[in-house]
Amino acid sequence: MDLFEYQAKELFAKHEVPTSAGRVTDTVAGAREIAEEIGKPVMVKAQVKVGGRGKAGGVKYSADVDAAQANAEAILGLDIKGHVVKKLLVAEASDIAEEYYISFLLDRTNRTYLAMCSVEGGVEIEVTAEENPDALAKIPVDAVKGVDLAFARSIAEAGKLPAEVLDAAAVTIQKLWEVFIKEDALLVEVNPLVRTPNDEILALDGKVTLDENAAFRQPGHEAFEDKDATDPLELKAKENDLNYVKLDGEVGIIGNGAGLVMSTLDVVAYAGEKHGGVKPANFLDIGGGASAEVMANGLDVILNDAQVKSVFVNVFGGITACDAVANGIVGALKTLGDEANKPLVVRLDGNNVEEGRRILAEAAHPLVTVVGTMDEAADKAAELAFAAK
């Protein structure tokens, strides 16, 4: 999960990383109020999860309150690379003597943590890495030993930071490592990490990516979720612990197991070529449980997608037997009632398949068609979706 800058700075403050004072707002009046509270020149900064804010006019220096208000008016609603600005960070402007770069990230290729540091900050680090790779130091970090002050100082030295700020930089670098580890981050980046005329070190910007797989031990991270930017169907699925990804097709898909669902996407896409080019509408994996509640939650998500014209339920009975799946489908349709208004093509195979098919046949729901093979089911689902377009 990528964070907004203001959220990254909340984590920085939690771990005593020095930053400039400021608050977030979503109104022009709020920006003016914050600027008045600070009582000094401020930076008005667009809060979007994309780079290039400054070049796009999303970061403005404001010498006084009136300038802050005018800049807030100009930035709110601005489109930056497809991201509309809905929030602003109004922060105290800092005197800058020099700009550096520091980050911690997970190096998947080498299966280790990596620190990157450079005396050349304030610019796109990708440009520095390409045009002057020697200016960007890359230091592997032992996951067990971590980063103490001595190692943090060696990171700053490798990045060729000036000797007079090494101690102050080491303190900040060590605290950024603390953010990285204690918050279960995949990336912690500060660009620029600035030196003030008084040789103070400040994190003027911040980029943090959190590991969503660690959410179970980070209950506070739920507050960082950007619900405005997340598809409402994906939010509903997440609330019900369903693995769901919305796609752009017309055939809704429910399966048990990621491999089976991905295979189902392929066969539906292939079948769709014969039926007007219809495509899969989603990826939805209900995992090992196919109870009536789980099936109802899954169908509720898919049937609320206006693009979906038919639903393909593809289940291989293993630990969860096919009769349990069939009972889940029947129960789900009863639970949903009139909301279940699109045809379902069901393919069952595996443990207790005959009993599962018997249960569905006995229920005789007018929306349900039971098909024997995966290819036949995909073809039928694509045909029904095309007919309903």
UniProtKB/Swiss-Prot annotation:
Residue positions binding ATP = 45, 52-54, 94, 99
Q: Which GO terms describe its molecular function?
A: ATP binding; magnesium ion binding; succinate-CoA ligase (ADP-forming) activity; succinate-CoA ligase (GDP-forming) activity
Cofactor detail note: Binds 1 Mg(2+) ion per subunit.
PROSITE patterns found in the cross-reference section = ATP_GRASP, SUCCINYL_COA_LIG_3
Q: So what does this thing catalyse?
A: succinate + ATP + CoA = succinyl-CoA + ADP + phosphate; GTP + succinate + CoA = succinyl-CoA + GDP + phosphate
Question: Which superkingdom is the protein from?
Answer: Bacteria
Query: So where does Mg(2+) get bound?
Result: 191, 205
> Does the record carry Magnesium as a key word?
yes
Q: How does it assemble?
A: Heterotetramer of two alpha and two beta subunits.
What protein name does the entry list? Succinate--CoA ligase [ADP-forming] subunit beta
